[in-house]
Amino acid sequence: MSEKRVEKKLIHYVKKALNDYHMINTGDRVMVCLSGGKDSYTLLSLLNSIRIEGNYKFDIFAFVLDQSQPGWDDSALRGWLDDKKIPYEILTRDTYSIVKEKIPAGKMYCSLCSRLRRGIIYRYAEEQGFSKIALGHHRDDLIQTLLMSVFYNGQIRSMPPKLLSDNKRHVLIRPLAYCQERDIIKYAMEQQFPLIPCNLCGSQKNLMRQRVKRLISDLAKENPKVPSNMLRALSNIKPSQLMDHELWNFRELNVD
């Protein structure tokens, strides 16, 4: 697939997500969380292209959190943002030391790291008056999270394309919700984004997610529609076919 075809495909699916879930309103100030990875770079690049087209009227801002990880170098990232004329701020907060201190060696850092990062993101967005916080999770993240929640937590849940935070102060959006990771990888390679590796957890493999990813891949070899059907299932819920006591009062579920 050519460079333009990949970009066109991704923009199509981002626009579809924006429209299906009413993610961005006219006049919104959208804060894109840029981690330095392929997903967040792709999100920022595509949203910026859509903004420049002019059919969606919103402002965009890149928020980068420097977590004081060893070897962190954002010079190329700064150059890329300057070249694209995207306003940004790189905020330094030493969450790295906290995570290393609190989490025993060999354990996964992701949970604590994400909680600390989320708190900083929320505070910054509120202080600066941003109306939307954009995250780079894509289709593969959503369906993998669904199975991980079922297999390991006993819950039917995932990552919604649009979410009101628990404190009701922030709206999170995931414009890449319909985009496949393989297309994002192609796009990131073509764009030659100056990626920044995560030295905190980048070397740690999330074994649960890797197993689920392999399972979905194996099933897709037998039936290519499996991933898209899983995504469709997230918006095609049949509560009457489930067994949640919070949805139904089974004691009183009788024929009159």
UniProtKB/Swiss-Prot annotation:
EC class name: transferase
Pfam short name (any one): ATP_bind_3
GO BP: tRNA thio-modification
Catalytic reaction list: cytidine(32) in tRNA + S-sulfanyl-L-cysteinyl-[cysteine desulfurase] + AH2 + ATP = 2-thiocytidine(32) in tRNA + L-cysteinyl-[cysteine desulfurase] + A + AMP + diphosphate + H(+)
Keyword annotations from UniProtKB, A to Z: 4Fe-4S, ATP-binding, Cytoplasm, Iron, Iron-sulfur, Magnesium, Metal-binding, Nucleotide-binding, RNA-binding, Transferase, tRNA processing, tRNA-binding
Cofactor(s) the protein needs: Mg(2+); [4Fe-4S] cluster
Protein name as annotated: tRNA-cytidine(32) 2-sulfurtransferase
Complex and partners: Homodimer.
UniProt motif PP-loop motif: location: 35-40
Residues reported in the UniProt entry to bind [4Fe-4S] cluster: 110, 113, 201
Higher taxonomy: Bacteria, Pseudomonadati, Pseudomonadota, Gammaproteobacteria, Legionellales
Role of this protein: Catalyzes the ATP-dependent 2-thiolation of cytidine in position 32 of tRNA, to form 2-thiocytidine (s(2)C32). The sulfur atoms are provided by the cysteine/cysteine desulfurase (IscS) system.
Alphabetical list of CDD domains matching this protein: TtcA-like (cd24138)
Cofactor: binding details: Binds 1 [4Fe-4S] cluster per subunit. The cluster is chelated by three Cys residues, the fourth Fe has a free coordination site that may bind a sulfur atom transferred from the persulfide of IscS.
Domain of life from the UniProt record: Bacteria
Gene Ontology cellular component annotations, sorted alphabetically: cytoplasm
GO MF term set: 4 iron, 4 sulfur cluster binding; ATP binding; magnesium ion binding; sulfurtransferase activity; tRNA binding
NCBIfam families in alphabetical order: PRK10696.1
